[in-house]
Amino acid sequence: MQVAPNVWSKYFNIPNPGLRAYFSNVVSGQPEVYRTPFYKGMSLESICDEWYKKLVSIDTQWPTLMEFEDDLRKKVGPMSVMLPLKERMSDIDSYYDSISKDQVPFDTKAISAAKSEWKGVSRLRLRSEVNTVAVMKKSTNSGSPYFSKRKAVVSKTIPCDVYMDGRYCVMRQNGREWSGAAVLGWRGQEGGPKPTDVKQRVVWMFPFAVNIRELQVYQPLILTFQRLGLVPAWVSMEAVDRRITKMFDTKGPRDVVVCTDFSKFDQHFNPTCQSVAKELLADLLTGQEAVDWLERVFPIKYAIPLAYNWGEIRYGIHGMGSGSGGTNADETLVHRVLQHEAAISHHTTLNPNSQCLGDDGVLTYPGISAEDVMQSYSRHGLDMNLEKQYVSKQDCTYLRRWHHTDYRVDGMCVGVYSTMRALGRLAMQERYYDPDVWGEKMVTLRYLSIIENVKYHPLKEEFLDFCIKGDKTRLGLGIPGFLDNIAGEAQKAIDMMPDFLGYTKSLQYDGDLRRNAAAGIENWWVVQALKSRR
């Protein structure tokens, strides 16, 4: 809805030419397909065709890995095309409409089972605002009200207090009161070879102050779960591999593993799911400050207004706002309850080596079937498609990696990343990168962060050679001193390139570990393999 200028100025520090220009781009969209210099002059289809000639050799020994590669090849394509606002309104509507589907409460036994898993967590207390801000990424946008770099407005933001008052979000920042709103953002995801295939993702850019108050809980929570190994994906991909291996080694030989697939999990994260997330957090927290936080801060991510154009704001309760500091944690905790409930409804117990992260999950229990899992999950208003659930006794896909009970490295069922997906990421950009900032070192670091994912692929060495041929610097081999000083180069890159490590790896370096996020890059497989080719 349109709001009056005097109302708009309660949400944003006006004048703000950067914000006005931003919304102008949101309205018009972005039609360009941004390519990298990788295999310059060749189409992405031609690059994939050339690599496929080598890739097909895995089909005989690992047919399900070949199927995994073939499936992801269909989705390889542009990522940078943003539709105009008018063509994205239905995606925004979905956040408000999808939470109203029929839903029943969760089984209390399933909630208790999840709580029992986490009983080793000491009663958590809130972090101070100062300590929370110290380990937050401050190179990103601050959102409402200043809409500038976070690092430029820290002193204007803390101390802060935030809470919902009816349909409004109140933000008190360093003695000044504002109304809070998320700003409509965008993320593109490959969906196929044509520009029209780009999947349009709604991003909720949360106010800096709201994120600070949220992360006072979620930072220590994730850190504690990391220390106890409760969510392997928050620890490392190696921890994920170990748990997948245990799952295959402990499940019944006739029992399948179900890899679950939700449609629009954020949008369908309804009041039933939200209340369970709150109950689970209440069980992990202690003290009056935590009680106040649960009443004042926790609900914001499900009710914060959305500024989607200059002078236009949408109000009302909705699904999960993606830019919240608690998006991944709330969804992961609730997803674990869903997994327990599926097993309990079948009168059995979940294999404890089942896993989930956000909407991504893999589970097994005696007598499991995809139909039973889907029926159990859908009771709570969540949307699933039976044809998209992957079922197998021997292999699974989790966090975009293929695992097989017989494909092991040092005894571990390691996760294999698709080389086809990697090619798409190497050739296509998510957004425009300023060439004055993105020199050849930054481009090469981005390439290496993508190629490192394939370190367990049976054709990893052949793939690396293929990639070297497609890059004018030969992946840094042609840049004097680059590989020898790669740790220093990576540290410089992280603030400039927020997704340099990838989303999952960023979660693994959350909290106190973020400052060491580049540590160990010199030991990456791809770096060592390149050095051996000098």
UniProtKB/Swiss-Prot annotation:
The taxonomy runs:
Viruses, Riboviria, Orthornavirae, Pisuviricota, Duplopiviricetes
> CDD domains this protein is in?
dsRNAv_Picobirnaviridae_RdRp
Ranges for domain RdRp catalytic: 255-373
Q: What is its EC number?
A: 2.7.7.48
Q: Name one GO biological process term.
A: DNA-templated transcription
Physiological role: RNA-directed RNA polymerase that is involved in both transcription and genome replication.
Is Signal among this UniProt entry's keywords?
A: no
Reactions listed under catalytic activity: RNA(n) + a ribonucleoside 5'-triphosphate = RNA(n+1) + diphosphate
User: What species does this protein belong to?
Assistant: Human picobirnavirus (strain Human/Thailand/Hy005102/-)
UniProtKB keywords: Nucleotide-binding, Nucleotidyltransferase, RNA-binding, RNA-directed RNA polymerase, Transferase, Viral RNA replication, Virion
- Protein name (database record): Potential RNA-dependent RNA polymerase
List where this protein forms a coiled coil: none
Q: Which GO terms describe its cellular component?
A: virion component
Subcellular compartments: Virion
| Pfam families in UniProt | RdRP_1
Instruction: Output the superkingdom of the source species.
Output: Viruses
> What terms describe the molecular function in GO for this protein?
nucleotide binding; RNA binding; RNA-directed RNA polymerase activity
